[in-house]
Amino acid sequence: MLFFEYFKSQLNNEIIVNLKNDISISGILKNVDPFLNIKIENVIAISTNEFIKINKSITNIQLCSIRGSAIKSVELKKNGLEEHMVEATRIKCNLDC
């Protein structure tokens, strides 16, 4: 739940999602659920794999849903990252301890 709470606090911020198939998707984080399924708005897709080509029709996506199990990593801006993680850990410790 620690990551879920952190991502919920980052709604409407810019995000880059790196998928397991070497495609990176960037946009504005609109929603996340406890399974870390992510919804992104104003999507831009980039392929880092030379064998996967991104079609021009894919580049004009307004809203994209990404299944949590397909995500390799997530990149966010570092604005207050340490503060948010400490706060989320403190909340979790108070609830569990």
From Swiss-Prot:
The gene is LSM2. One of its GO terms (molecular function) is RNA binding. One of its GO terms (biological process) is mRNA splicing, via spliceosome. The keyword Methyltransferase does not apply. This is Probable U6 snRNA-associated Sm-like protein LSm2. Component of LSm protein complexes, which are involved in RNA processing and may function in a chaperone-like manner. LSM2 binds specifically to the 3'-terminal U-tract of U6 snRNA. Required for processing of pre-tRNAs, pre-rRNAs and U3 snoRNA. InterPro entries: LSM_dom_sf (IPR010920), Sm (IPR047575), Sm_dom_euk/arc (IPR001163), U6_snRNA_Lsm2 (IPR016654). It is found in: Nucleus. Belongs to the snRNP Sm proteins family. Residues 2-80 form the Sm domain.
